[in-house]
């Protein structure tokens, strides 16, 4: 714990002031504000002028849910992040695990797109389909010119009236049917896009057998076809108000925000202690979120602060990958932890990929703090700051990636744990 306090205090003092340099507030409007900058795997940004106007995102654009709420005298004020609809994959897209399919490489006879069509003579394989260079996402090699695919989806209930989507990757183009009804029929390329299903298509999704059928064309070049069925879950509206943002200020090792939340002022700093003369500290997989609450009217106020995160931090494709969330305590600290179930270490490569191995951590001081984990794996801390005119504290965000780099086929440990005998808990203490 003393190690933690010394690093945090040194970083705060350094970025606040030095003996001969006065820190000047940065008034430039950033295209995106850095919040968490542990490494390219674990980074989070705000692409809004006000911190509460948009969801927090990874640098690739994928949402990394992070929501902060300050409750003053029973009134909640959201100062960080924003809720957004979530996708629940009823039939998963291809990842480390493929999906069963029947396919033909020549034009089949009859109404091959219909639900009750007999495809027993077709070839059995696994999706996704495409060029071998796209493995491990590809499970059946195919490079063209055409492939006919049928994917059976077993449902345990009707989805009539639900907000349903087709998730589609098709390079070059495809005609796609759901239970015999055309959903996509054009020459557009689709790269992980969501296509809303019309009411008649959604009404056709019944308990039992359903079929997604497609003919995919790839005249030349690299090929890929992946399809899934998705339900978009509505936002669970909460009654909190938003804070009033006073400023946003980006400095070399921190991004600072100021807010008013009713009768109190809230200052929040996202801090990354990247002292370049200390490689162990630079590689340390921990960032801080510090906060300070001050009464504006000189009166004591009852204040609670909460920080929420989703398992999206620990997976490449949130909603499509299974996750596990848990909580535990150690040496005066309270931990929230999220991990993918598959744990395929350094098993993927590409331009739009995120880490899906190792574990994400949200950490707080144990005193006066409650840790919550929902059935969906969402995690939250609620800390009671009591009744006072001034209070302060911090949360920590970290990631244990186990292995960071693959070098000529060999997985190498992160520098902070290069000997393999350092625990992630010690990095928070």
What are the residue ranges of the model-derived segments?
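Acidic/polar, glycine-enriched structural segments that form the non-catalytic walls/loops
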Residues: 19-34, 43-44, 49, 84-114, ...
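Edge beta-strands of jelly-roll/beta-sandwich modules across compartments, strongly enriched
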Residues: 218-229
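Aromatic-lined ligand-binding clefts that engage carbohydrates, nucleic acids, or primary amines
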Residues: 122, 145, 153-180, 212-214
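Short, surface-exposed tryptophan/glycine-enriched loops
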Residues: 154, 192-217
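C-terminal motif of bacterial Sec signal peptides marking the signal peptidase cleavage site
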Residues: 15-16
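Sec-dependent signal peptide recognition
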Residues: 2-8
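Short beta-strands within extracellular/lumenal beta-sheet-rich domains
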Residues: 141-156, 195-199, 254-257, 379
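Extended, loop-rich substrate-binding clefts of extracytoplasmic carbohydrate-active enzymes
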Residues: 134, 142-146, 236-284, 365-377
């Amino acid at each position: 714990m003393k190690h933690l306090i010394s690093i945090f205090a040194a970083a705060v003092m350094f970025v606040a002031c030095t003996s001969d340099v006065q820190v000047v507030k940065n008034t430039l409007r950033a295209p995106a504000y850095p919040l968490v900058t542990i490494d390219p795997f674990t980074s989070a940004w705000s692409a809004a002028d006000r911190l509460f106007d948009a969801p927090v995102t990874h640098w690739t654009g994928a949402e990394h849910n992070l929501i902060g709420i300050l409750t003053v005298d029973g009134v909640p004020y959201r100062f960080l992040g924003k809720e957004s609809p979530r996708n629940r994959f009823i039939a998963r897209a291809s990842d480390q695990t493929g999906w069963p399919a029947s396919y033909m490489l020549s034009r089949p006879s009859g109404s091959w797109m219909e639900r009750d069509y007999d495809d027993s003579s077709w070839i059995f394989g696994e999706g996704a389909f495409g060029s071998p260079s796209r493995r491990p996402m590809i499970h059946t090699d195919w490079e063209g010119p055409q492939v006919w695919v049928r994917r059976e989806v077993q449902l345990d209930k009707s989805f009539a009236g639900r907000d349903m989507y087709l998730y589609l990757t098709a390079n070059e183009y495809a005609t796609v049917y759901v239970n015999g009804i055309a959903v996509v029929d054009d020459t557009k390329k689709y790269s992980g896009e969501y296509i809303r299903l019309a009411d008649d298509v959604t009404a056709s999704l019944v308990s039992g057998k359903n079929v997604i059928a497609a003919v995919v064309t790839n005249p030349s070049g690299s090929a890929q076809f992946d399809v899934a069925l998705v339900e978009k879950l509505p936002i669970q509206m909460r009654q909190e108000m938003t804070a009033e943002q006073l400023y946003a200020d980006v400095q070399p090792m921190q991004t600072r925000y100021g807010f008013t939340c009713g009768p109190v002022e809230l200052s929040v700093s996202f801090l990354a202690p990247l002292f370049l003369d200390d490689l162990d500290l630079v590689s340390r997989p921990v960032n801080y979120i510090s906060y300070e609450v001050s009464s504006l009217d000189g009166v004591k106020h009852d204040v609670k602060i909460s920080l929420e995160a989703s398992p999206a931090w620990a997976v490449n494709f949130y909603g499509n990958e299974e996750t596990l969330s848990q909580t535990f305590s150690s040496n005066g600290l309270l931990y929230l932890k999220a991990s993918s179930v598959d744990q395929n270490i350094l098993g993927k490569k590409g331009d739009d990929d995120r880490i899906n191995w190792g574990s994400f951590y949200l950490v707080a001081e144990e005193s006066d703090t409650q840790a919550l984990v929902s059935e969906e794996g969402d995690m939250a801390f609620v800390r009671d700051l009591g009744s006072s005119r001034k209070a302060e504290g911090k949360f920590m965000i970290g990631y244990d990636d186990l292995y960071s780099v693959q070098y000529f086929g060999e997985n190498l440990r992160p520098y902070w744990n290069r000997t393999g005998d350092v625990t992630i808990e010690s990095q928070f203490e």
